[in-house]
Amino acid sequence: MSDLMPTLPGLSPVAGKSVVAKFDGGLLSSDGGLLLLREVELRLRVAERLAACIKDPRAPDQITHSLADIIRFRLLMISAGYEDGNDASSLRGDPMFKSALDLVPSDRDLCSQSTISRLENLPDAPTLLRMGGAMVDLYCASFHQVPKRIVLDIDDTFDAVHGDQQLRLFNAHYDEYGFQPIVVFDGEGRFITCALRPAKRPGGKEIKAFLRRLLRAIRNHWPRTEILLRGDSLLRPGGARLVSRERLGLYPGRRAHYDLTPSYRRPRGQHESSLRGRTKAG
């Protein structure tokens, strides 16, 4: 009977050994999905991209866990639902996590909670900006050809915290402490970048600085691509002036109250026509 049980093909080898996933019981793990996340990481190399932005102050001859491995372990922890860095103490010897980092169960343990904490406090402001730019580079690299136009959906979102995290702030609207990061997706729902910030509405100066860096990073890859911004009151007049100066298209959301000039109406109308065409075709 077990010979008829299907297997999950296509998993990459770990330390030169083949990996076979079956569904016939035996020793089970609730974190078996880490092997699939490993395949995503092998393709995208997110940990390596972020690690390349950080200057490692450690002595090279005394390093056991590379920055990329520490980041990769942390990303996998969060993806598997272990958001607390303290969980690393019990997960560093877990065979599934080891396999996801190209180690066999008998190999050394992964990094400790204290190592993760030191890494998370290592980046300064310029380093964080480089890391945000690395995510934009990853987004642009995901296209097989240069797009003629992209839509950037820009918004902020509330993220509650339950400790004494740095930058946490009480938000009266949500009646909780937390962060209020700015997040950017494209019109197809693909993540582009984000900026962690205190739980308050960003001002016009902050939005302009964020947009300026984002646009510069995108245009380093696609100088001729038309960019259409879509947002609500987050794109307040300070952001609107930047839109005009950078010759962008603006597609406000429901809470914005801008008097759109013809240069704004044209790309908005084109985008709405495109959406109607897709709806009819579907």
Language-model-detected regions and their locations in the chain:
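Acidic/histidine-rich, metal-coordinating catalytic segments
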Residues: D155, E226-L235
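Acidic, His- and aromatic-enriched active-site or binding-groove loops in soluble protein domains
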Residues: Y174-G178, R212, R245-D259
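Distinct, well-ordered alpha-helical segments
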Residues: I207, L211, G239-L242
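An anionic, glycine-rich sequence signature occurring as long contiguous blocks
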Residues: D3-V19, G249-G282
